[in-house]
From Swiss-Prot:
GO molecular function, one term: aspartic-type endopeptidase activity
Keywords assigned by UniProt, alphabetized: Aspartyl protease, Glycoprotein, Hydrolase, Protease
Species of origin: Capra hircus
EC class of the enzyme, as a word: hydrolase
One annotated GO biological process: proteolysis
Family: Belongs to the peptidase A1 family.
Superkingdom of the source species: Eukaryota
Entry protein name: Pregnancy-associated glycoprotein 59
Known EC number: 3.4.23.-
Tissue/organ expression: Placenta.
Processing and modification events after translation: Glycosylated.
Amino acid sequence: RGSXLTTLPLRNIMDMLHMGXITIGTP
């Protein structure tokens, strides 16, 4: 469970950053 808790946030942050980059890149 510890590894899952550590992996989920990282993936979530990466996804959020990716989505943010797409939102900023798309006017």
